[in-house]
Swiss-Prot record:
This is Terminal uridylyltransferase 4. Residues 258-272, 603-623, 828-837 have a biased composition (Basic and acidic residues). Residues 108-123, 146-156, 163-174, 194-209, 226-242 have a biased composition (Polar residues). The gene is Tut4. A zinc finger (CCHC-type) spans 930-947, 1310-1327, 1358-1375. The modification Phosphoserine is found at S102, S131, S176. The lineage of its organism: Eukaryota, Metazoa, Chordata, Craniata, Vertebrata.
Length: 1644
C-alpha cells in the first residue's frame, strides 16, 4: 500500500508539471510473501529486484527507493488523489518501467509488436526509475474462496506478462501522434499540454464511469463486462495513441528506417514508449482469467468497493505495483489481501465514521419555513432569558462609577471605563464586569495595579479582592458587595477596548448580530469550550466568528472593514492599513502606515513575478500604480451595507452552525474580519493547527491560541457537529418524544424492510443495522433518553447519528487526511480541495449523487436492517455495522417507501416544533475535555495540576534535639573545612593569572590586563573551581568601541600557542563572549571574558557578605554541596548556577528574623542612594565591614546554630517563600513581586543585585523547577527528622542523592546530546564542530617538522595517546618534550624503554587494605605539591609489571613503593576526609570524588607504557596484571587522559557495580552531565619540581563511604577506572599532621 504525497506536493496538483525526483520512498501494503522475480515484461531486461533493499517490516509495509534520473510529467489531466473517480494519470510523458500486455482482443495479435521495448530502451533500462517488488512476510487476511481464486488468476497473469528478451531486440515502440521526433522535450511538453487539454473531456467520458453505471454493467454478465472493458480501453488507445494495427505496422517500419534518429532522441522516445504502455496496459487482464476466476475477482472487488477501495484502470506512474486505491484514505494497495488488512486499520475505520457523519450532515433536508420559524423563536427567547437587559447594563455602569470614585480618591490622574461583553450587550446574566484603568505614561503598569489591589482591599464596597497577575491580561479580581457581580480590573488594555467599541457598534447597526452572538456564546458555555484557562477559546472570539460568518455568507450581511474601495489597497499589504477605532458609531477609522518588512516582501514578490512573466507594458503600469498607491493616509470604512439583506434569524443560526461544521476549513484558514478574501495560515505565518482567529486591532497573535490541545479541538469540532445535527432536524414539542402510534410505527418498520431500488449503487448505499438503543443500554445509559434522542433525528435509514459518537472511534489520534465531499454551498471547502488537488472534474457527478440523498429516520434501526450481507468491520467498541448489500460509508440511499407519519412531520406547524438549548443534548452527555496549561495534560486544570510542587502537602517536622542539632552543625562545618581552598591554592591561582597576562601581553597586546573574579575571589569557591578571568585593555573604559567577537577569536588563536594550556574553545555566541581553556599542570579550567566589570563588583559584594558572619560561608558551601549532590547546580544544563544558590542563601539570611546579615545596598548616608555606575547599572554597596556594627547594633542578635539555619533555609523555601509571587532579591529588604519585574512567566525568579534585568532563573524549565523543589522538599524531611547515623556515616545519610531526588535523574530534555548543555541543538554543538573542524593553519604552525610524513592524513585521524589531544602523535606531544626536559638525567634509551616496555612498580613491604590509603612521599611535606593522576587501568588479569627505577641522581626523584598491604586497615590509619577536593579524575570523573562521597578502594595498576613520575598504588594480591603494549586497542582508542590537578587525592575505585562513569554518579547518575575532563590515558607531568602548590588540608573527621552511596548512572557507559598516586610523609612534623602512615623505610 502506498501513500501519495500531501497536498503541497506537485504530484497531485492539476495543471502542473511533475518532476519525479530520485530515490522516492514508496509505501506498499502486501499481505503475501513476494518472491523475487525478473519481470521482463515490465522493465525490459532489468530485474525488479536488482536495486531491492530486501528489508521487511512486521506491519507489511515495505519501502522502495527508486534511484534513477528525474522525469518530467505533465499533469494537466491528472485528477487529484482524493477524487472519488478512478485515478487517471498523464498519458504521454512520464517515465515508466512496464511493458504492456494487451487487454484488447482485437489487437491481441499485434500487442507485442506494437508495444515492446527497443534495444535502445534496453540499454537505458537501468536509467529508468525502478519500483521492484520487495519480499515481504505478512499475515494473510481472511478472504473468501472467490478471493483466493482471484489471487491464483493474478499470479498466472504475472507469469503471462513476462516477455522473452529476445523478442524485444528488433522492435520499436510507436510514436504518439502528440510527440514529433525532432521537437525538444520542453517544446514537446507545451504541445502535449495543449493537445491534452482538448482531449480532457473525451478521456473523462471514457475512463471515469459513474458508480451506478459500473454497477449495472456488472449485473449484465461477464461477457458484456469484458466487452465494455475492451471498448473502453480501445477508445482510450484511439484517443491517446495509435488506433489500429496498420499504424503499428508502420511503426515497425519506422523503426528500421529511423534507427539513427531514435538514438539521438532516445530519452524522448523512452518517455513516450513507457507512457504508451501505461495508456494501454490494464491493471488486471481479465481476458487471461477463467470464468470462475473472473467471477471471484468481481465478487472480491465488489466487496472492496463498499469500503471505498477501487481497482485502478491504469497503473499509477509512481506506484506501478499497486492495483487498488483506497479513496477514503488515499492509499495505494498492491493486492486484495492488502486491501483487507487496510480495511481493519484504525485509520480506515475512523475515516469511515467521519465520512459517514459528514455525509449524514450534508444530506440533511433543507429546513422548512416552520422549521426556521421555530429556530428563530428559540434564539430570540434565549437572548431574552440569558442576555442582559438595559437595567442590567445600568447596574454594571453604576459599579464602574462607584469604583472610579474609590480609586480616583488615591489616584486622581486615572480614569475607569467599561469594556467587554457588558458594553457590547453580548454578556450573559452571569458574565463578569470588565473594567479598564486609563493612566498617564509616567505611571508604571505593575505599580498601578498593585496600588489598586491595596485600595480595593481597604474598601468596604468590595469583597474577595484578589490578584491574578499571572494571567495573560493581569487583573485585580473582586466582587461587588451590593450586586454580587464579579469585577475584573485591568490597566492599559487599549486594544480590547477598541475591539469592544467595534462589536458594540455592530450590535447597534445590525439587529440580528446581538441575538446570534448571545446564542453562540451560550452554546459555547453549555459545552464548556469558552474557558480560556482550561484550554478553551476566549468568549469574545465567538463574536468575531459570528461577524466573520455574516461577512462570508452569500449574500453577506456585513461588509469587511478593508477592501478595494480604499485607494491603493492591496491584500498582500493589508497590515499596512491599521484600524484606529470607531467614528460616528457607523464607521471604522483606518490609517496607512507603510511597513518596511511588508515592502521588502512585496518587492521580492514583484521581482520574482517580473523574472517569471514576460514583459508587458499594461502589467507594468498596473504594478506601478499599485506600488504608488495608498496616497490617502487615513480614511473610514462603513460598518453596514448600503442595501442590507433581510434573512430570518433561525436561518442565520442554522447557517452559522453549518458554516463552521461543514463549509469552513478551520485548520486551513484564518478567521479574519478585516478583508473579504480568505486569509490562509501561510499569510500570517501561523501553524496549521486547530483554530486561528485574528483580532482586527491586534493582528500579530492568534487570539485563539489558548486552544492548544488537539483533544480540546476535536471536542470543539464534535460539539459543532452535534449542534448542527440537532438544530437541522425537526424536533417535536413535548420533550422531543415521538408521538407515533403503534400502528404507524409498525408500518414504518415493515416499509423499511423493502428492498432498495435496483438503480441504487452498491457502492453508495449503507444501512447501519445496530440500533442506538442497544448501544446506549450496553453503556449503561437510560433507555428513555435513547428513545428521545433517537426519534428526534432524521438521518440515514435505520441510523441514529449519535451512533458515530457512541462507537468511540472519532477521537483516534492517528492523523489521516479525510476525503471531503464538496457540497453546493461549500465554497471554502472547494477552495481548499482545489488547492490540494483533491477534486477532479468527477466531483460534479459526486455532488449530484450526494444531493440525491434522502435521509429517513426510523425508530428502530435494528429491525429495519437487511441481513443479506454483514460486514465485520472491527471497531473499538466491539459493535458491528450491518450492511444490506451496500456500503458502510455512504449515505446515497433511496428508499422505496416513506412512512406517512414522517412525511407528515415535515408539514407540522411551527407551534409543534420546539428547540431548547439543553446541555445534555448539545454535549451528547460527554464531559468537557480539560487540558492543564502547566503540564499540557488532559483531565485536570492548572489549579489541580499534580506537577505543581506548591500542591504538595508538607508534613510537620518533629522537634529538634540537641544531639541532632550538633550533628547538623558538624555536617555544615565540614562542608566548608574540606572544600574551601587554602591560601596556597589562592597563591597558585594568582601565579597562573600572572603567567597568562605576561603571555597575552607578549603575543597579543601589551595593554591587556587580567584580573580574577567569581568563585576564586568571592569566598565561596571550591578547590577545583574554575578560573574566571576578566580582560581589559588600557585606554578603553568599556567595550563599546571594541569588536568583542573578533578579539575573543584572536585571543583563542593566541592561547593555542601557549604550551601550558589545552582545549582552547572560543564561545562568541554567548551573552558575554568568552574563551574557555584548561591549564595543563593544575588541571583547572578557566574562561577569559572581556570587560565583565560588573561581575567583579558582584564578587566584591559576595566577599563582603562572607566576611560579615562566618555562618554565611558555612551555609554557602553546604548549599553548593547539596546542589551538586542533587545534580541541580549547573546552569549550562538547565538548572541554577552556584551563584544563584549563593544568592538564595544570602536572601534567606537577610529575611531571617532577626536577620543574620544586613542588606548592604540599603546602607548609605543621606536620602539618595550613592551612584557607582558600571555598565549602565548602579554597583554601589556598603563595603566598610568594620563600621557595620556601629551602624547596625542589632546585627549580632541572631544566635542560631548552623544546623538550625540550614534546616530553616530548607523550610523557608519549601514552606514560606512563594516562588510564583515573589523574586529572590538581595538588594532590598522589602518583598519584590514577580509582577513588578514582569517575570510572571518564569518559574523561579532570582534577581542579580546589580544587573536588575538579569533573572538567574530565566533558563529553568518547569520540569527542572519541579525537580529542584522536590530536592528541597526531600532535604527538608531528611535534615528535619532527627536521626543518628553511625559515626562516620553522617554524610552518607544526609547527602544521599537517591533519597534527595527520589532516585530520579535531573531532566535533560533541553540539553544537547553531544555536550549535555542547553542553548543549542546537537547540530550546532561547538564540541561537535571542533571535532569536525580542520585547522589546517594551526596544523602547519605546530607540526612543520613532520609535515611531509603526514601530508595525506587528516587532522581528525591523528590523536596522541599520551595526552589524548587530536592533531598530533605521541612523538610530537608537548608533554613528552616536557618530560624529557624535566628528566634530563634519564638516558634516552631508558625513556624509550619506559614508554615501550611494560614494567612493574616496586612497592614497600606493607600491604594496602581494602580502604584506599593516601600517604606522602619522603620528599614531601604538608605543603608539597600534589600528585598527578595515573592512567586508567586495564583488565585486572594482566600480569604485574616490574618497577620503574627512579633516576639515581635527581634530588626530586620518587622512591620505590613496596608491595601492597594485606589484611585490614591498621588502627592508627585514618580514612579520607569527607570533602577533600583533590585531583579531578580522568574522563567522565568529577571533582566530587574528593568530597569522599565516592567509594575509595585499592585498585591494581597496570604496567606503565608511558613515563610515570612518582610512586604508584598496587593492586591487592591475587591478581596477575599482564603487559600492555602500545598496539593495545585500549590505548589507541582510549578516552582522553585525566585532568591533572594539584591537589592530593585518594585512589578511586574502578569497580562500579553498574560500570558507570563516576562523574555520572556524582551528578546523580546523568552520564556526561558534568564537564568531562577528556585527557587521554596518560597524565601530564606532575608538579614535583614546580614551586610549592596546594597542600593537603589535614582532616580530623574521617568518613568511609560505601561504594553504592552514589547514584548509579547509565549502565551502557563503560568507564575506564582511575588510579591515583600514593604520597609519603617526609618529616616527623608532616607525619604527625598527616592522617596516613608512611610506607616503607623512611629515614627520620
Amino acid at each position: 500500500m502506498e501513500e501519495p504525497k500531501t497536498s503541497k506536493n506537485e504530484n497531485h496538483e492539476p495543471k502542473k508539471n511533475i518532476i519525479c525526483e530520485e530515490s522516492k520512498a514508496v509505501k506498499i501494503i502486501s499481505n503475501q510473501t513476494l518472491k523475487p522475480r525478473n519481470d521482463k515484461s515490465e522493465i525490459g531486461t532489468s530485474s525488479l529486484n536488482r536495486n531491492s533493499s530486501k528489508k521487511t517490516k512486521q506491519n507489511d509495509i515495505c519501502i522502495e527507493k527508486t534511484e534513477a534520473k528525474s522525469c518530467k510529467v505533465n499533469a494537466a489531466s491528472v485528477p487529484g488523489p482524493k477524487d472519488l473517480g478512478l485515478v487517471h494519470r498523464d498519458q504521454s510523458h512520464c517515465k515508466m518501467k512496464k511493458l504492456p500486455n494487451s487487454p484488447m482482443k482485437a489487437q491481441k495479435g499485434s500487442s507485442q509488436t506494437k508495444l515492446e521495448k527497443t534495444p535502445s530502451l534496453q540499454t537505458k533500462a537501468e536509467k529508468v526509475p525502478k519500483s521492484p517488488n520487495l519480499p515481504v512476510k505478512a499475515e494473510k487476511a481472511p478472504c473468501t474462496t472467490a478471493e483466493a481464486t482471484t489471487e491464483k488468476a493474478l499470479n498466472s497473469q504475472r507469469k503471462e506478462e513476462n516477455t522473452p528478451t529476445s523478442q524485444m531486440k528488433l522492435q520499436k515502440t510507436p510514436r504518439s501522434p502528440l510527440e514529433p521526433e525532432n521537437v525538444p522535450s520542453l517544446l514537446l511538453k507545451e504541445n502535449v499540454k495543449q493537445t491534452e487539454s482538448q482531449q480532457t473531456g473525451k478521456k473523462l467520458t471514457s475512463s471515469f464511469v459513474s458508480m451506478d453505471k459500473r454497477k449495472s454493467e456488472a449485473l449484465q454478465g461477464e461477457k458484456s463486462a469484458l466487452e465494455n472493458s475492451s471498448l473502453s480501453q480501445k477508445q482510450q488507445t484511439q484517443t491517446d495513441n495509435i488506433a489500429d494495427s496498420d499504424d503499428s505496422a508502420s511503426g515497425i517500419e519506422d523503426t528500421a528506417d529511423d534507427l539513427s534518429k531514435m538514438k539521438s532522441e532516445e530519452s524522448n522516445k523512452e518517455n513516450s514508449s513507457e507512457m504508451d504502455y501505461l495508456e494501454n496496459a490494464t491493471v488486471i487482464d481479465e481476458s487471461a482469467l477463467t470464468p470462475e476466476q473472473r467471477l471471484g475477482l468481481k465478487q472480491a472487488e465488489e466487496r472492496l468497493e463498499r469500503d471505498h477501495i477501487f481497482r485502478l484502470e491504469k497503473r499509477s506512474p509512481e506506484y506501478t505495483n499497486c492495483r487498488y486505491l483506497c479513496k477514503l484514505c488515499l492509499i495505494h494497495i498492491e493486492n486484495i489481501q492488502g486491501a483487507h488488512k487496510h480495511i481493519k486499520e484504525k485509520r480506515h475505520k475512523k475515516n469511515i465514521l467521519e465520512k459517514q457523519e459528514e455525509s449524514e450532515l450534508r444530506s440533511l433536508p433543507s429546513p422548512s419555513s416552520a422549521h426556521l420559524a421555530a429556530l428563530s423563536v428559540a434564539v430570540v427567547e434565549l437572548a431574552k432569558e440569558q442576555g442582559i437587559t438595559d437595567d442590567d447594563l445600568r447596574i454594571r455602569q453604576d459599579i464602574v462609577e462607584e469604583m472610579s470614585k474609590v480609586i480616583m480618591t488615591f489616584l486622581p490622574e486615572c480614569s475607569l471605563r467599561l469594556y467587554g461583553s457588558s458594553l457590547t450587550k453580548f454578556a450573559l446574566k452571569s458574565s463578569d464586569v470588565n473594567i479598564d484603568i486609563k493612566f498617564p505614561p509616567k505611571m508604571n503598569h505593575p505599580d498601578l495595579l498593585i496600588q489598586v489591589l491595596g485600595i480595593l482591599k481597604k474598601s468596604a464596597l468590595y469583597i474577595d479582592v484578589e490578584s491574578d497577575f499571572h494571567a495573560k491580561v493581569p487583573v485585580v479580581v473582586c466582587k461587588d458587595r451590593k450586586s454580587a457581580l464579579l469585577c475584573r480590573v485591568s490597566a492599559g488594555n487599549d486594544m480590547a477596548c477598541l475591539t469592544t467599541d467595534l462589536l458594540a457598534a455592530l450590535g447597534k447597526v445590525e439587529p440580528v448580530f446581538t441575538p446570534l452572538v448571545l446564542a453562540f456564546r451560550y452554546w459555547a458555555k453549555l459545552c464548556y469550550i469558552d474557558s480560556q484557562t482550561d484550554g478553551g477559546i476566549p468568549s469574545y472570539c465567538f463574536a468575531l466568528m459570528v461577524m466573520f460568518f455574516l461577512q462570508q455568507r452569500k449574500p453577506p450581511l456585513l461588509p469587511c472593514l478593508l477592501g478595494s474601495w480604499i485607494e491603493g489597497f492591496d491584500p498582500k499589504r493589508m497590515d499596512d492599513f491599521q484600524l484606529k477605532g470607531i467614528v460616528e458609531e457607523k464607521f471604522v477609522k483606518w490609517e496607512y502606515n507603510s511597513s518596511s518588512a511588508t515592502e521588502k516582501n512585496l518587492i521580492a514578490d514583484e521581482n520574482k513575478a517580473k523574472a517569471d512573466e514576460p514583459k508587458d507594458d499594461t502589467k507594468k503600469t498596473e504594478t506601478d500604480n499599485q506600488s504608488n498607491a495608498a496616497k490617502a493616509k487615513h480614511g473610514k470604512s462603513p460598518l453596514t451595507l448600503e442595501a442590507p439583506n433581510q434573512v430570518p434569524l433561525g436561518q442565520l443560526w442554522l447557517e452559522l452552525l453549518k458554516f463552521y461544521t461543514l463549509d469552513f476549513a478551520l485548520e486551513e484558514y484564518v478567521i479574519c474580519v478585516r478583508i473579504q478574501d480568505i486569509l490562509t495560515r501561510e499569510n500570517k505565518n501561523w501553524p496549521k493547527r486547530r483554530i486561528a482567529i485574528e483580532d482586527p486591532f491586534s493582528v500579530k497573535r492568534n487570539v485563539a491560541r489558548s486552544l492548544n490541545s488537539q483533544l480540546v479541538y476535536e471536542y470543539v469540532v464534535e460539539r459543532f457537529r452535534a449542534a448542527y445535527r440537532y438544530f437541522a432536524c425537526p424536533q417535536k414539542k413535548g420533550g422531543n418524544k415521538s408521538t407515533m402510534d403503534p400502528k404507524k410505527k409498525e408500518k414504518g418498520k415493515l416499509s423499511s424492510k423493502k428492498p432498495v431500488k435496483s438503480d441504487c449503487s452498491a457502492t453508495n448505499c449503507c444501512i447501519l443495522g445496530e440500533s442506538a438503543e442497544k448501544i446506549h443500554m450496553e453503556r449503561g445509559q437510560p433507555a428513555k433518553h435513547d428513545e428521545t434522542e433517537f426519534t428526534s433525528q432524521r438521518c440515514i435509514v435505520d441510523n441514529d447519528s449519535l451512533l458515530v459518537n457512541e462507537l468511540g472511534l472519532a477521537n483516534h489520534g492517528q492523523d489521516s487526511s479525510s476525503l471531503s465531499t464538496a457540497s453546493g454551498g461549500s465554497d471554502l471547502k472547494q477552495k481548499s480541495a482545489e488547492k490540494q488537488g483533491d477534486l477532479t472534474p468527477s466531483e460534479t457527478s459526486l455532488k449530484k449523487e450526494l444531493s440525491q440523498c434522502i435521509c429517513i429516520g426510523t425508530p428502530d434501526g435494528a429491525e429495519s436492517a437487511g441481513t443479506d450481507c454483514r460486514s465485520n468491520l472491527e471497531m473499538d467498541s466491539s459493535h458491528q455495522i450491518v450492511c444490506n448489500n451496500v456500503s458502510a460509508t455512504s449515505c446515497n440511499c433511496k428508499a422505496t417507501e416513506v412512512t406517512s407519519d414522517l412525511v407528515d412531520e415535515d408539514n407540522l406547524p411551527s407551534q409543534e416544533l420546539y428547540y431548547v438549548f439543553d446541555k445534555f443534548i448539545l454535549t451528547s452527555g460527554k464531559p468537557p475535555t480539560i487540558v492543564c496549561s502547566i503540564c499540557k495534560k488532559d483531565g485536570h486544570s492548572k489549579n489541580d495540576c499534580p506537577e505543581d510542587f506548591r500542591k504538595i502537602d508538607l508534613k510537620p517536622l518533629p522537634p529538634m534535639t540537641n544531639r541532632f542539632r550538633e550533628i547538623l552543625d558538624l555536617v555544615c562545618k565540614r562542608c566548608f573545612d574540606e572544600l574551601s581552598p587554602p591560601c596556597s591554592e589562592q597563591h597558585n591561582r594568582e601565579q597562573i593569572l600572572i603567567g597568562l597576562e605576561k603571555f597575552i601581553q607578549k603575543e597579543y597586546d601589551e595593554k591587556a590586563r587580567l584580573c580574577l573574579f567569581g568563585s576564586s575571589k568571592n569566598g565561596f569557591g571550591f578547590r577545583d573551581s574554575d578560573l574566571d578571568i576578566c580582560m581589559t585593555l588600557e585606554g578603553h573604559e568599556n567595550a563599546e568601541k571594541l569588536n568583542c567577537k573578533e578579539i575573543i577569536e584572536n585571543l583563542a588563536k593566541i592561547l593555542k600557542r601557549h604550551p601550558g594550556l589545552r582545549n582552547i574553545l572560543p564561545i562568541t555566541t554567548a551573552k558575554v563572549p568568552i574563551v574557555k581553556f584548561e591549564h595543563r599542570r593544575s588541571g583547572l579550567e578557566g574562561d577569559i571574558s572581556l570587560y565583565n566589570t560588573l561581575a567583579q563588583h558582584n564578587t566584591r559584594m559576595l566577599a563582603t557578605y562572607a566576611a560579615i558572619d562566618p555562618r554565611v560561608q558555612y551555609l554557602g558551601y553546604t548549599m553548593k554541596v547539596f546542589a551538586k549532590r542533587c545534580d541541580i547546580g549547573d546552569a549550562s544544563r538547565g538548572s541554577l548556577s552556584s551563584y544563584a544558590y549563593i544568592l538564595m542563601v544570602l536572601y534567606f539570611l537577610q529575611q531571617r528574623k532577626p536577620p543574620v546579615i544586613p542588606v548592604l545596598q540599603e546602607i548609605f548616608d543621606g536620602k539618595q542612594i550613592p551612584q557607582r555606575m558600571v555598565d549602565g547599572w548602579n554597583a554601589f554597596f556598603f563595603d566598610k565591614t568594620e563600621e557595620l556594627k556601629k551602624r547596625l547594633p542589632s546585627l549580632g542578635k541572631n544566635t542560631e546554630s548552623l544546623g538550625e539555619l540550614w534546616l530553616g533555609l530548607l523550610r523557608f523555601y519549601t514552606e514560606e517563600f512563594d516562588f510564583k509571587e515573589y523574586v529572590i532579591s538581595i538588594r532590598q529588604k522589602k518583598l519584590l513581586t514577580t509582577f513588578e519585574k514582569q517575570w510572571t512567566s518564569k518559574c523561579i525568579a532570582i534577581e542579580d543585585p546589580f544587573d536588575l534585568n538579569h533573572n538567574l532563573g530565566a533558563g529553568v524549565s518547569r520540569k527542572m523547577t519541579n525537580f529542584i523543589m522536590k530536592a528541597f522538599i526531600n532535604g527538608r524531611k531528611l535534615f528535619g527528622t532527627p536521626f543518628y547515623p553511625l559515626i562516620g556515616r553522617e554524610a552518607e545519610y544526609f547527602f544521599d542523592s537517591r533519597v534527595l531526588t527520589d532516585g530520579e535523574l535531573a531532566p535533560n530534555d533541553r540539553c544537547c546530546r553531544v555536550c549535555g548543555k542547553i542553548g543549542h541543538y546537537m547540530k550546532d554543538c561547538p564540541k561537535r564542530k571542533r571535532l569536525k573542524k580542520k585547522d589546517s593553519e594551526e596544523e602547519k604552525e605546530g607540526n612543520e617538522e613532520e609535515k611531509d610524513s603526514r601530508d595525506l592524513l587528516d587532522s581528525r585521524d591523528l590523536r596522541c595517546f599520551i595526552c589524548g589531544d587530536a592533531g598530533h602523535v605521541r612523538r610530537e606531544c608537548p608533554e613528552v618534550k616536557m618530560a624529557r626536559q624535566r628528566n634530563s638525567s634519564v638516558a634516552a634509551a631508558q625513556l624509550v624503554r619506559n614508554l615501550v616496555n611494560a614494567q612493574q612498580v616496586a612497592g614497600s613491604a606493607q600491604q594496602q587494605s581494602d580502604q584506599s590509603i593516601r600517604t606522602r612521599q619522603s620528599s614531601e611535606c604538608s605543603d608539597s605539591p600534589s600528585y598527578s593522576p595515573q592512567p586508567q587501568p586495564f583488565p585486572q588479569n594482566s600480569p604485574q609489571p616490574s618497577a620503574l627505577p627512579p633516576p639515581p641522581s635527581q634530588p626530586g626523584s620518587q622512591p620505590k613503593l613496596g608491595p601492597p598491604q594485606q589484611g585490614g586497615q591498621p588502627p592508627h590509619q585514618v580514612q579520607m576526609p569527607l570533602y577533600n577536593f583533590p585531583q579531578s579524575p580522568p574522563a567522565h570523573y568529577s571533582p566530587m570524588h574528593s568530597m569522599g562521597l565516592l567509594p575509595m578502594h585499592p585498585l591494581q595498576i597496570p604496567a606503565p607504557s608511558w613515563p610515570i613520575h612518582g610512586p604508584m598504588l598496587h593492586s591487592a594480591p591475587g591478581s596477575t596484571p599482564s603487559n600492555i603494549g602500545l598496539n593495545d586497542p585500549s590505548i589507541i582508542f582510549a578516552q582522553p587522559a585525566a585532568r591533572p590537578m594539584a591537589i592530593p587525592s585518594p585512589s578511586h575505585d574502578g569497580h562500579w557495580p553498574r560500570t558507570v562513569a563516576p562523574n555520572s554518579l556524582v551528578n546523580n547518575g546523568a552520564v556526561g552531565n558534568s564537564e568531562p575532563r577528556f585527557r587521554g590515558l596518560n597524565p601530564p607531568i606532575p608538579w614535583e619540581h614546580a614551586p610549592r602548590h596546594f597542600p593537603l588540608v589535614p582532616a580530623s573527621w574521617p568518613y568511609g563511604l560505601h561504594q553504592n552511596f552514589m547514584h548509579q548512572g547509565n549502565p551502557r557507559f563503560q568507564p575506564k577506572p582511575f588510579y591515583a598516586q600514593a604520597d609519603r610523609c617526609a618529616t616527623r612534623r608532616c607525619r604527625e599532621r598527616c592522617p596516613h602512615p608512611p610506607r616503607g623505610n623512611v629515614s627520620e
